[in-house]
Amino acid sequence: MSRVYVGNLDPRVTERELEDEFRAFGVVRSVWVARRPPGYAFLDFEDPRDARDAIRALDGKNGWRVEQSHNRGERGGGGRGGDRGGGGGGRGGRGGSDLKCYECGETGHFARECRNRGGTGRRRSKSRSRTPPRYRRSPSYGRRSYSPRARSPPPPRRRSPSPPPARGRSYSRSPPPYRAREEVPYANGNGLKERRRSRS
């Protein structure tokens, strides 16, 4: 069995997608995709020759870095690929020290077969995808136009025509009261009688 390291992966890639890509070159026994942190994965081929064919064909495709796994430390589990290259451990040899789960840290099974898997890793991936939408809905004020409405000018005010000035004299006035002829007194006191006589 031969282990292949795949780097520069899209964090959204799934195990099924990787398995579909690599199984065209041979039998893939297991696939493990890192989630904390994401960006790399390991695949175990049953035949080392199939692993080498996959490396030659897929290295550089989609920006991936595909190579044989050699001594990559405990975290990624890459260093165990060389130890298991000619062995027949597979899934039947669960008692071997090279079978270690990278999800729970226990030996005897792969991370793909871990019962504790799907807990923190999947929850975290769901929490990342639940980012609140940003400005998906356009605000209501954006649909309204703020152009001022055309207002018709107010109609001119009509002034009531003033009555024409009176051209003639008004006859509504009452005539002045009749004044009796004044009697002009004379020195002799008989002025009225003498006046009448003089007229006659």
Curated annotation (Swiss-Prot):
<keyword id="KW-0597">Phosphoprotein</keyword>
<dbReference type="InterPro" id="IPR036875">
    <property type="entry name" value="Znf_CCHC_sf"/>
</dbReference>
<feature type="region of interest" description="Disordered">
    <location>
        <begin position="112"/>
        <end position="200"/>
    </location>
</feature>
<feature type="modified residue" description="Phosphoserine">
    <location>
        <position position="160"/>
    </location>
</feature>
<feature type="domain" description="RRM">
    <location>
        <begin position="2"/>
        <end position="71"/>
    </location>
</feature>
<dbReference type="InterPro" id="IPR001878">
    <property type="entry name" value="Znf_CCHC"/>
</dbReference>
<dbReference type="Pfam" id="PF00076">
    <property type="entry name" value="RRM_1"/>
</dbReference>
<feature type="modified residue" description="Phosphoserine">
    <location>
        <position position="162"/>
    </location>
</feature>
<dbReference type="GO" id="GO:0005737">
    <property type="term" value="C:cytoplasm"/>
</dbReference>
<feature type="compositionally biased region" description="Basic residues">
    <location>
        <begin position="120"/>
        <end position="137"/>
    </location>
</feature>
<feature type="compositionally biased region" description="Pro residues">
    <location>
        <begin position="151"/>
        <end position="166"/>
    </location>
</feature>
<dbReference type="GO" id="GO:0005730">
    <property type="term" value="C:nucleolus"/>
</dbReference>
<feature type="zinc finger region" description="CCHC-type">
    <location>
        <begin position="99"/>
        <end position="116"/>
    </location>
</feature>
<keyword id="KW-0747">Spliceosome</keyword>
<dbReference type="Pfam" id="PF00098">
    <property type="entry name" value="zf-CCHC"/>
</dbReference>
<dbReference type="InterPro" id="IPR012677">
    <property type="entry name" value="Nucleotide-bd_a/b_plait_sf"/>
</dbReference>
<keyword id="KW-0963">Cytoplasm</keyword>
<feature type="compositionally biased region" description="Low complexity">
    <location>
        <begin position="138"/>
        <end position="150"/>
    </location>
</feature>
<keyword id="KW-0508">mRNA splicing</keyword>
<protein>
    <recommendedName>
        <fullName>Serine/arginine-rich splicing factor RSZ22</fullName>
    </recommendedName>
</protein>
<dbReference type="InterPro" id="IPR035979">
    <property type="entry name" value="RBD_domain_sf"/>
</dbReference>
<keyword id="KW-0479">Metal-binding</keyword>
<keyword id="KW-0863">Zinc-finger</keyword>
<keyword id="KW-0539">Nucleus</keyword>
<feature type="compositionally biased region" description="Basic and acidic residues">
    <location>
        <begin position="62"/>
        <end position="83"/>
    </location>
</feature>
<comment type="similarity">
    <text>Belongs to the splicing factor SR family. RSZ subfamily.</text>
</comment>
<feature type="compositionally biased region" description="Gly residues">
    <location>
        <begin position="84"/>
        <end position="96"/>
    </location>
</feature>
<feature type="modified residue" description="Phosphoserine">
    <location>
        <position position="200"/>
    </location>
</feature>
<keyword id="KW-0507">mRNA processing</keyword>
<dbReference type="GO" id="GO:0005886">
    <property type="term" value="C:plasma membrane"/>
</dbReference>
<keyword id="KW-0862">Zinc</keyword>
<dbReference type="InterPro" id="IPR050907">
    <property type="entry name" value="SRSF"/>
</dbReference>
<feature type="modified residue" description="Phosphoserine">
    <location>
        <position position="152"/>
    </location>
</feature>
<dbReference type="GO" id="GO:0016607">
    <property type="term" value="C:nuclear speck"/>
</dbReference>
<comment type="subunit">
    <text>Component of the spliceosome. Interacts with AFC2, RS2Z33 and RNU1.</text>
</comment>
<dbReference type="InterPro" id="IPR000504">
    <property type="entry name" value="RRM_dom"/>
</dbReference>
<dbReference type="GO" id="GO:0005681">
    <property type="term" value="C:spliceosomal complex"/>
</dbReference>
<feature type="modified residue" description="Phosphoserine">
    <location>
        <position position="138"/>
    </location>
</feature>
<dbReference type="GO" id="GO:0003729">
    <property type="term" value="F:mRNA binding"/>
</dbReference>
<dbReference type="GO" id="GO:0000398">
    <property type="term" value="P:mRNA splicing, via spliceosome"/>
</dbReference>
<dbReference type="GO" id="GO:0008270">
    <property type="term" value="F:zinc ion binding"/>
</dbReference>
<feature type="modified residue" description="Phosphoserine">
    <location>
        <position position="174"/>
    </location>
</feature>
